[in-house]
Amino acid sequence: MDQLAHLYHAHMAELNRRVGEICQRENLSGLVIHSGQPHRQFLDDLNYPFKVNPQFKAWLPILDTPNCWVIANGQDKPTLVFYRPVDFWHKVNDVPQAFWTEHFDIQLLTKPDRIADFLPKDLASWAYIGEHLDVADVLGFAARNPDAVMNYLHYHRADKTQYELECMRRANQIAVKGHLAAKNAFYDGASEFEIQQRYLLEIGQGENEVPYGNIVALNQNAAILHYTALEHVKPAQRLSFLIDAGASYHGYAADITRTYSFEKNRFYELIVALDKVQLAIIEQMKPGVKYVDLHIATHHYIGQLLIDFGLANGTAEQLVAQGVTSAFFPHGLGHMLGLQVHDMGGYSHDERGTHIAAPEAHPFLRCTRVLAANQVLTIEPGLYIIDTLLNQLSATAKQAINWTTVDEMRPFGGIRIEDNVIVHQDRVENMTREFGLVD
């Protein structure tokens, strides 16, 4: 942890600088950041799995403890009010002792409703940052998630500190181990459910610890973009496998996708071809490049793949203009990555919150930023046989499609290949590939 401790010192300095700057700009005394609180299931005495406020875990890697608070003004040492109740029903987390604790004045809270005792006495100029506005009301906060503050914080989420980049490297390293285990499980004949268990066992994280619900899809299920059903029964015929699965490290996410063919066939060749497209797009990433331009370039690459593999006729430009490529590749090229899988700030033009909308022809693109050093993004081109989208094409566009080849590819579902990439000033760092997930 020595390296993380060193990097964390600079990380805290940057977070304090940001808080000081936005509070001075907005005439605030500071921010009070709430980790969150449990949500009770309807008509039950059980809570939903706790998910921490991402603005809270930006400060420290406490991910599983509700009713905690960070009090920061950008000048003084931040206070961590750590919830440690007297409870014989549940495990009570120990008082933190880690590489980051020296940076906080840690105070212990035993009852959630006693938090007012730990907060500044006059909250008129302090801003509450969190989900539970009812709690903020009771405590007397006038400023609750003010737009100017949130826009500022979201915009700067794209600019990762060196501590954050190292956490994301470690998240990728963990996830790659899971992907390799899942790949072997697929070729060993496992079901979707069994592959999922193999993955989680390998990375040592549970379903509520990974950053999102894993997509483990065999055969035609790979055409369902957010498939999470996990069939227990093994398919009668094993054709293809798409896995979109991540891992967490200190609250930072990895988000990786791979697709495999059970046999060396035409679908396998299409995977190889799309992999080359993905790497070609990554090579074009550098500061100053518009992410929208990379997305549109990907559509032209995919248009050529459709022609090369006999899925469509015409030119790549025609297939893009007719919307054919959007039927085969309906989602965005990727998104910003960090504390959240779809990290905040992907549409932010500036600190003030100026919104850059996705192009009208590509409404599902999650990032419209201009690339800059220390940003982390996913690059995830895909190609799927989704009948719903193909059927919605115009008559002219349908004429460009070779339906015989589409029918042949349909049982394989689709392909997605996704890496996590750091943009540096003079290079790109493909974390996913560098940790050994090369195919």
Curated annotation (Swiss-Prot):
Residues the entry annotates as binding Mn(2+) 2: D244, D255, E418
| Gene3D superfamilies attached to this UniProt entry | Creatinase/methionine aminopeptidase superfamily, Creatinase/prolidase N-terminal domain
First-level EC class:
hydrolase
Q: Which residues does Mn(2+) 1 bind?
A: D255, H335, E380, E418
Which Gene Ontology molecular function entries are recorded, alphabetically? aminopeptidase activity; metal ion binding; metalloexopeptidase activity; phosphoric triester hydrolase activity; proline dipeptidase activity
Q: Write the protein's name.
A: Xaa-Pro dipeptidase
Gene Ontology CC terms: cytosol
What does this chain do?
Splits dipeptides with a prolyl residue in the C-terminal position.
- Give the similarity note: Belongs to the peptidase M24B family. Bacterial-type prolidase subfamily.
The protein's UniProt keywords, in alphabetical order, are: Dipeptidase, Hydrolase, Manganese, Metal-binding, Metalloprotease, Protease
